Structure formats: structure tokens, C-alpha cells
């Protein structure tokens, strides 16, 4: 019964978030339908006339001269799905680990529970350390489903480009608004995503699609839970990670990849105890 209670609470909080968003966001929210000859994936690309998306980040002057020197980035699937997140002190354990990261940008996946989302972005320590954040769509799929689960925390201003949602997926992802979030920090471009689970065939097609749809031509880093054990081979890239990132499958599912070969990265997996925390280990990358 407890997971069901948490799900009902999530739906209520999601409704409150939307009320807050449409009252407070000064940006004009538009949905642009993109035509695609590939019938397998029909994306919706969300764009704004400002950098705000969802109940999102602080506005900033893009012409303001802000010195940005990125040293380290992180991706982590935190498994905040309602079926798991009610157990023990899980979300606080996750926040405690995030506090210890020395990264400039942190990309999280599976931040599905709105209560968990609020605890992360409103945590006093994290708010001071990461004053900027960005999300994928906060809309729940089929009302009772899940949102995108994507959350980006940043020490520096974020420029939002687009969120491309996958509409044709399979179970269990058909119940979530999964997609790819494209953004920039300084002169470095990022794509963060969480691809189809339990079906590598679909995940690989999604991977190729979001790369083909990328607005970026240089200094582009892909990071997230790709749910593919051979993602580097799939993209024709040098394998930068030979260590497992997923506890139960003992697979390499989480990646930080340089797509344009103009950024040098040193990859490291943070193998701490995942008890009452997540089923994935964080992946860190230091800029060389």
C-alpha cells in the first residue's frame, strides 16, 4: 500500500507544480511538433523563448561575462521511482552523496517522484552550490504515469536548447515521458537522456535518433543511462569505461561520452555502497 500512497501523493504534487509553474514562469511555453519519416519514433520537441523550462532555473543575462571553467561532470540514475523511493531514508542518502560530489554539472535520471525533486532542488546546501537547474518535461505520461525523470544541477548558468520526447516506446517506459535534454554551459554542449530499459534494440534506435537530431556540431558530451552494454561500439567511439555501473545486471549502462572528439575526458565510476540509495553507481568525468 505504501508505494500506492506515494504515487497518489506524486500526482497531487505534480498538479501543484503545474499551478506554480504557469503562475511564475515568465517564458512563453510552446510545443513544436516535428515531422519525421521514421514511424518508429515520433518526437515532440519542446522549446521556450527563454531559458526557463518547467519550474526551472534562475534567469540570467546571456551577454553577461561569466567565466566558466568546467572541471568535472557527473551522471547518476538515482532510482527515485515511487515503487522504490518510499523505503527508509533513501532520498536523504542520495542527497548526502550529491553533496559530496565535486562536480560542476550533475545530470540525474529517474527523479520521477515530485517530492524527491523538490527535496533536491530546494535543499539549502545544494541550492547554494548549484544555483541553476534544468529539467525535462514535468508532465506525467497518461496522467498516472511518470515524467521525464531528468534533472540537471549546475554551478553555472544553463542555456536550454530543446527537450525531445520519445512517444513510441515499449513497457515499462511507455508509462514515462522519457526523452533527451539538450543544453549548454559556457561553450560546452550536453545531451542527457535515459533510454528504453530492458530492450536494447529500441534503446539503440533512440540513441541514434537523438544524436541525429542534435543541434550541436562541436564540443558535445552525451551522458546518462543509455541502457546499452555496448554503447561505445554502437556509436563507433573508443570505449572509455570498462567498469560496471548497474548493480543487479553487472552491466555498463551509464556513460559519459565525447561525441565530437574535441573534448578530452577521464572517466571514473564511484563504487560506494548502494544500500538504500540506488541500483546504479554514479559516473564522473574530469576534463583534461
Where are these regions (language model features)?
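Active-site beta-strand/loop signature of hydrolases that rely on acidic residues for catalysis
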Residues: 72-78, 94-121, 153, 183, ...
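Structured beta-strand-rich core segments of catalytic domains in phosphoester-bond hydrolases
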Residues: 27-65, 105-187, 269-273
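Flexible, surface-exposed loop/gating regions in the mature catalytic domains
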Residues: 78, 134-156, 160-194, 222, ...
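Acidic/histidine-rich helix-loop elements
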Residues: 70-92, 141-143, 170-175, 196-199
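Metal-dependent phosphoester-hydrolase catalytic domains
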Residues: 2-62, 201, 214-221, 226-288
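Activation segment
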Residues: 82-85, 115, 162, 199, ...
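Short, flexible/disordered intra-domain loops and linkers
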Residues: 83-89, 118-120, 145, 233-235
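Soluble or luminal CAZymes and related metallo-dependent hydrolases
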Residues: 86-94, 116, 173-178, 201-209, ...
Amino acid at each position: 500500500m505504501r508505494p500506492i500512497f506515494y504515487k497518489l501523493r506524486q500526482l497531487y504534487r505534480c498538479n501543484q507544480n503545474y499551478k506554480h509553474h504557469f503562475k511564475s514562469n515568465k517564458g512563453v511555453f510552446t510545443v513544436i511538433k516535428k515531422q519525421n519519416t521514421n514511424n518508429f519514433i515520433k518526437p515532440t520537441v519542446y522549446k521556450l523563448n527563454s531559458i526557463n523550462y518547467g519550474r526551472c532555473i534562475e534567469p540570467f543575462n546571456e551577454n553577461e561575462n561569466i567565466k566558466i571553467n568546467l572541471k568535472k561532470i557527473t551522471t547518476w540514475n538515482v532510482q527515485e521511482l515511487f515503487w522504490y523511493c518510499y523505503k527508509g531514508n533513501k532520498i536523504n542518502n542520495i542527497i548526502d552523496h550529491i553533496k559530496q560530489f565535486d562536480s560542476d554539472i550533475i545530470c540525474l535520471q529517474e527523479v520521477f517522484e515530485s517530492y524527491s525533486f523538490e527535496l533536491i532542488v530546494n535543499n539549502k546546501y545544494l541550492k547554494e552550490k548549484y544555483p541553476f537547474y534544468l529539467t525535462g518535461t514535468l508532465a506525467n505520461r497518461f496522467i498516472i504515469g511518470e515524467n521525464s525523470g531528468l534533472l540537471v544541477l549546475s554551478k553555472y548558468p544553463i542555456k536550454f536548447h530543446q527537450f525531445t520526447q520519445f512517444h513510441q516506446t515499449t513497457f515499462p517506459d511507455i508509462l514515462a515521458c522519457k526523452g533527451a535534454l539538450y543544453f549548454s554551459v559556457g561553450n560546452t554542449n550536453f545531451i542527457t537522456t535515459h533510454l528504453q530499459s530492458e530492450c536494447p534494440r529500441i534503446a539503440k534506435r533512440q540513441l541514434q535518433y537523438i544524436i541525429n537530431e542534435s543541434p550541436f556540431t562541436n564540443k558535445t558530451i552525451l551522458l546518462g543511462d543509455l541502457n546499452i552494454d555496448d554503447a561505445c561500439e554502437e556509436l563507433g567511439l573508443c570505449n572509455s569505461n570498462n567498469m560496471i555501473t548497474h548493480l543487479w545486471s553487472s552491466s555498463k549502462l551509464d556513460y559519459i561520452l565525447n561525441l565530437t572528439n574535441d573534448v578530452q575526458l577521464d572517466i571514473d565510476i564511484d563504487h560506494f555502497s548502494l544500500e538504500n540509495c540506488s541500483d546504479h553507481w554514479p559516473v564522473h568525468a574530469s576534463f583534461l
